[in-house]
Amino acid sequence: MMQICDTYNQKHSLFNAMNRFIGAVNNMDQTVMVPSLLRDVPLSEPEIDEVSVEVGGSGGCLEERTTPAPSPGSANESFFAPSRDMYSHYVLLKSIRNDIEWGVLHQPSSPPAGSEESTWKPKDILVGLSHLESADAGEEDLEQQFHYHLRGLHTVLSKLTRKANILTNRYKQEIGFSNWGH
Amino acid sequence: MQVLTKRYPKNCLLTVMDRYSAVVRNMEQVVMIPSLLRDVQLSGPGGSVQDGAPDLYTYFTMLKSICVEVDHGLLPREEWQAKVAGNETSEAENDAAETEEAEEDRISEELDLEAQFHLHFCSLHHILTHLTRKAQEVTRKYQEMTGQVL
């Protein structure tokens, strides 16, 4: 009766944006066999990335870091470290992919560390929206709000997709670089 | 009415989008004469009618137009702005759009990508859930008015 799936085959649909992102993260996941190699490697922006392929010191870093994949506990620590290396980006991208695939509502949200620095946390949004639902004000601009968040999500997803692709390429470069030396 | 819930987990945003889409389609099928909804208010939880609340016809058109974006993706920015300008030509609205954009920029600067993602993702989830309920209410009210209550 409902042919909903067909309509998703639109270029700008959220479904496609999410799929692109999930694809990029899956690709990253498959490429990065030893995530701990990404520790302490800064994630450069694409412009810089193209120019300075031979990132100084990162090759040595690779040789030192041959430990197996870290435990989830240590993952959480570096995930919320103030300065993010490639590894924390890697963990972040995977966690966002899971949120997209499984939904975020029933997950224990914001961790204790680092939660005070940002004023916009999912909990605040929940409170804000439940307030919105009960109050009569704000009904008219639901459409605007919807559009605003849809556009925002699109923008964020495309940035994240780009990040996942950069990370995958950087990892390949790092691996290639270290193999080159041997 | 058939909702595609099996392809994704229950809480997934895509499930919520599917459900919204299906509920609005159902509403469109039920409401044969939308103009009947003019000047009809949704009664509140206690049966009270809120002053100044939009009528059901306003809801009906809004829910339909949001459904287009849910199904077909984002309108190009210019098209959206033209649409907003076409609906409400007052200066105040334009100012509001400008402040919204300024607000948007401010948020982008302040938040990291993760927080931005969660802000938009959760908000969309809630807005769509809320709108789905509204579409169901409009449908039910129409059925009541036309004596089709099952």
Curated annotation (Swiss-Prot), chain A:
GO biological process, one term: regulation of lipid biosynthetic process
Tissue: During embryonic development, expressed mainly in the neuroepithelial midline, urogenital apparatus and digits. Detected in adult white fat, liver, heart, brain and kidney. Expressed at very low levels in lactating mammary gland.
Cytoplasm found in the keyword field: yes
Modified residues (Phosphoserine): S71, S74, S78
Predominant location: nucleus
Keyword Acetylation in record: yes
Pfam families hit by this protein: Spot_14
Subunit text: Homodimer in the absence of THRSP. Heterodimer with THRSP. The homodimer interacts with ACACA and ACACB. Promotes polymerization of Acetyl-CoA carboxylase to form complexes that contain MID1IP1 and ACACA and/or ACACB. Interaction with THRSP interferes with ACACA binding.
The name this protein goes by in its record: Mid1-interacting protein 1
Curated annotation (Swiss-Prot), chain B:
InterPro entries: Lipogen_MT_Stabilize_sf, Spot_14
Segments of this protein annotated with the region Disordered: 83-104
Modified residues annotated as Phosphoserine in this record: S90
A GO cellular component annotation in the UniProt record: cytosol
Mutant lacking the gene: phenotype: Decreased lipid synthesis in the lactating mammary gland. Milk has reduced triglyceride content, causing reduced weight gain in nursing pups. Adults exhibit reduced body fat content. No effect on lipid synthesis in liver. No effect on the expression of thyroid hormone-induced lipogenic genes.
GO annotation terms (biological process): lipid metabolic process; regulation of lipid biosynthetic process; regulation of triglyceride biosynthetic process; response to bacterium
Compartments where located: Nucleus; Cytoplasm
Superkingdom as given in the UniProt entry: Eukaryota
Main location: nucleus
Pfam hit, one: Spot_14
Tissue localization of expression: Mainly expressed in tissues that synthesize triglycerides.
UniProt keyword terms in alphabetical order: Cytoplasm, Lipid biosynthesis, Lipid metabolism, Nucleus, Phosphoprotein, Transcription, Transcription regulation
Biased segments, Acidic residues type: 90-104
UniProt-recorded Gene Ontology molecular function terms: identical protein binding; molecular function inhibitor activity; protein homodimerization activity
Assigned protein family: Belongs to the SPOT14 family.
Subunit structure: Homodimer. Heterodimer with MID1IP1. Interacts with THRB and PLAGL1.
Role of this protein: Plays a role in the regulation of lipogenesis, especially in lactating mammary gland. Important for the biosynthesis of triglycerides with medium-length fatty acid chains. May modulate lipogenesis by interacting with MID1IP1 and preventing its interaction with ACACA. May function as transcriptional coactivator. May modulate the transcription factor activity of THRB.
Name this protein carries in UniProt: Thyroid hormone-inducible hepatic protein
Organism: Mus musculus
Gene behind the chain: Thrsp
